[in-house]
Amino acid sequence: MRGKKFVAAAVLFAATTSIRAQDLVTYHIDHAATQGLKGLRNIRNHLDVDPTAKITVVTHAQGVDMLFVDAKGEGGIEYAPLVAALRARGVEFEVCEITLKNRDLKKTQFIQEAGFTPSGVVRLAKLQKQGAAYIKP
């Protein structure tokens, strides 16, 4: 019986270790004009070095603007293709619904890669509680 408990504990430890082997990372964007392109570039570089990282981008306030349909950054660079390429690599993009309400925005104004969260700030806190690294470009 004692041997079975040891094996069960070893299996649980191995499973926990393999889960934690994947880095959890949160990118916080609250101003698209100054953080949007820089953040997307950082995320691309992050995944180029560590393709197993699980990355979530949480946007609120003016940060949600980068996920609008037809949104463009500095130099007229379109955000949508950059976001789509990162989404294809497993990156999650989330828009704060409180921002939608406060700015009278509709979900239909956002690209299809955008997901939604009731509160960007609460989502950031929960991701950090789960052990995600916090990066603000």
Model-derived features: positions:
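Bacterial N-terminal signal peptides that target proteins for export
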Residues: 1-7
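Bacterial N-terminal signal peptides
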Residues: 8-15
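Sec/Tat signal peptide C-region and signal peptidase I cleavage site
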Residues: 17-21
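Acidic/histidine-rich, surface-exposed loop or edge segments in extracytoplasmic proteins
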Residues: 22-30, 59-68
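Loop/turn elements at helix/coil->beta-strand transitions in domains of secreted/extracellular proteins
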Residues: 22-24, 51-55, 88-92, 130-133
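N-terminal targeting signals for Sec/Tat export/insertion, comprising classic cleavable signal peptides
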Residues: 30-57
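Mid-chain, structured segments of secreted extracytoplasmic proteins
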Residues: 61-110
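C-terminal partner/receptor-binding element of secreted or periplasmic proteins
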Residues: 112-137
